[in-house]
UniProtKB/Swiss-Prot annotation:
SUPFAM superfamilies: GroEL apical domain-like (SSF52029), GroEL equatorial domain-like (SSF48592), GroEL-intermediate domain like (SSF54849). It comes from Salinispora arenicola (strain CNS-205). It catalyses: ATP + H2O + a folded polypeptide = ADP + phosphate + an unfolded polypeptide. Pfam families: Cpn60_TCP1 (PF00118). This is Chaperonin GroEL 1. Its EC number is 5.6.1.7. NCBIfam families: GroEL, PRK00013.1, PRK12849.1, PRK12850.1, PRK12851.1. GO terms for biological process: protein refolding. It is an enzyme of class 5 (isomerase).
Length: 540
């Protein structure tokens, strides 16, 4: 395919035009009085959203150079969303301001590489100040405030704070669609996995369709069980103890399953069989987690353990198990606390090393099942469009709340950037074009506050100057138009969100400024449709 090449100012201006189109569509959503954007879908109803990354993802421009510019800014929004769950619009506004100021200086003859160094030095200094400004999250109310701002709904903030309070820092909070209207929080006690009983005959409570056992033994096997001969020795030992038995295996079939069902129906021996969760290596890892949690061992021929040689020391214990047709919950496993902590540390190390978002998410789920707990927020709404938008907002708010717990909170409303900038630039000792690069960042830091004010119908420049002159930590409450102590008023942002937005924006801005040529695919002309034979006349 033929390529088009643009150089110098033409290349940079093409990229800037694309960036401006995307940024202008995204920045109208910033702040409590930000507007919504309607996104057309090829199939189904349009989506209405004020989430920066969702809007950015939908924008595809026709001009090849503009398209590349827009793609670069999409990357800023996506990266910020991945890291912190929020701050996508802030990152876009910062990137646009830095690029606009930077290109003006490059056109005036500044050295792009020196500007880049100045930008990077200034951003590092501001990031440091942000972390100094940050206060640790100490109360449930602070988590609720942070999540409420992200979701734009106080009731969402409260339910997320409740969930985090229950499952702890390591816990997993998932968001699911519900058929009922409103919000509902469901907490899981103990470890839960998505596999239920193999046969309905194992139920002990037909009304609730559950098998519930107190103080059971738990046999964990990493293979299929089909022969009753292999299973008999351990069954006899468990029967003598008078306790029920939960068997977790790759599969249980044939005479082994029939024997368990017959004994359960006759009331001779209480047991329930479930399939092991996951597949392949992930299944092995999850069985290992269950074994450590319950104080048992995984019976696997790989490590020389055979089913017919199992004794009671090798099986796990728990205070209670609840098995439904879809899931199994193990409450209060009898595992050794030190071993569980060791496993938790091992999973944490794997999370740090992992490059894949999917793997990291699965490892985080395993960690939550061992160390914290699992909370499910069920979301309902009147229409499909509202449901999708609400679910997305709540998922972002959950990540936002976790970011707040991680690195602390700073005053919200774009004020933290302005006030961190006041002290950060005093320390810098830069000259020439590097000092100009730092000045570009200083001007850009006002961008988010200015845009929040504009979206609230106020004069951006006046608001920025007023905030610069008032006490640290005070700023504009755009919802009311007054100036307040932001922390006390609950207008807060996670430091991680603000820091990530600034760092990602500066990274893309530096790329824009140092670009000297752009190579793009030449759009192919679509051939005109051939004329219909006979002049295209139709005979009716």
């Amino acid at each position: 395919m033929a390529k088009m090449i643009a150089f110098d100012e033409e290349a940079r201006r093409g990229l800037e035009r694309g960036m401006n189109q995307l940024a202008d569509a995204v920045k109208v959503t910033l702040g409590p009085k930000g507007r919504n954007v309607v996104l057309e879908k090829k199939w189904g109803a349009p989506t209405i959203t004020n989430d920066g990354v969702s809007i950015a993802k939908e924008i595809e421009l026709e001009d090849p150079y503009e398209k590349i510019g827009a793609e670069l800014v999409k990357e800023v929004a996506k990266k910020t969303d991945d890291v912190a769950g929020d701050g996508t619009t802030t990152a876009t506004v910062l990137a646009q301001a830095m690029v606009r100021e930077g290109l003006r200086n490059v056109a005036a003859g500044a050295n792009p590489m020196a500007l880049k160094r100045g930008i990077e030095t200034a951003v590092a200094s501001v990031s440091e100040e942000l972390l100094k400004l940050a206060k640790d999250v100490e109360t449930k109310e602070q988590i609720a405030s942070t999540a409420s701002i992200s979701a734009g709904d106080p009731s969402v903030g409260e339910i997320i704070a409740e969930a985090m309070d229950k499952v702890g820092k390591e816990g997993v909070i998932t968001v699911e669609e519900s058929n009922t209207f409103g919000l509902e929080l469901e907490l899981t006690e103990g470890m839960r996995f998505d596999k239920g009983y193999i046969s309905a005959y194992f139920m002990t409570d037909p009304e609730r369709m559950e098998a519930v056992f107190d103080d059971p033994y738990i046999l964990i096997v990493n293979s299929k069980i089909s022969s009753v001969k292999d299973l008999l020795p351990i069954l006899e030992k468990v029967m003598q103890s008078g306790k029920p038995l939960l068997i977790i295996a790759e599969d249980i079939e044939g005479e082994a399953l029939a024997t368990l069902v017959v004994n359960k129906v006759r009331g001779t021996f209480k047991s329930v069989a479930v399939k092991a969760p996951g597949f392949g290596d992930r299944r092995k890892a999850m069985l290992g987690d269950i074994a450590i949690l319950t104080g048992g061992q995984v019976i696997s021929e790989e490590v020389g353990l055979k089913l017919d040689a199992v004794n009671l020391d090798m099986v796990g214990r728990a205070r209670k198990v609840v098995v439904t047709k879809d899931e199994t919950t193990i409450v209060d496993g009898a595992g050794d606390a030190e071993q569980i902590q060791g496993r938790v540390n091992q999973i944490r190390a794997e999370i740090d090393k992992s490059d894949s978002d999917y793997d990291r998410e699965k490892l985080q789920e395993r960690l939550a099942k061992l160390a914290g707990g699992v909370a499910v927020i069920k979301v309902g709404a009147a229409t499909e469009v509202e449901l999708k938008e609400r679910k997305h907002r709540i998922e972002d708010a959950v990540r936002n709340a976790k970011a707040a717990v991680e690195e602390g909170i700073v005053p919200g409303g774009g004020v933290a950037l302005v006030q961190a900038g006041k002290t950060a630039f005093d320390k810098l000792d830069l000259t020439g074009d590097e000092a100009t690069g730092a000045q570009i960042v200083k001007i850009a830091l006002d961008g988010p506050l200015r845009q929040i004010a504009v979206n609230a119908g106020l004069e951006g420049g006046v608001v920025v100057e007023h905030v610069r002159g008032i006490e640290a930590g005070h700023g504009l409450n755009a919802a009311t138009g007054g100036y307040v102590d932001l922390m006390a008023a609950g207008i807060i942002d996670p430091a991680k969100v603000t820091r990530s937005a600034l760092q990602n924006a500066s990274s893309i801005a530096a790329l824009f400024l140092t670009t000297e040529a752009v190579v793009a695919d030449k759009p192919e002309k679509t051939p005109a449709a051939p004329a219909a034979p006979g002049g295209g006349e139709m005979d009716f």
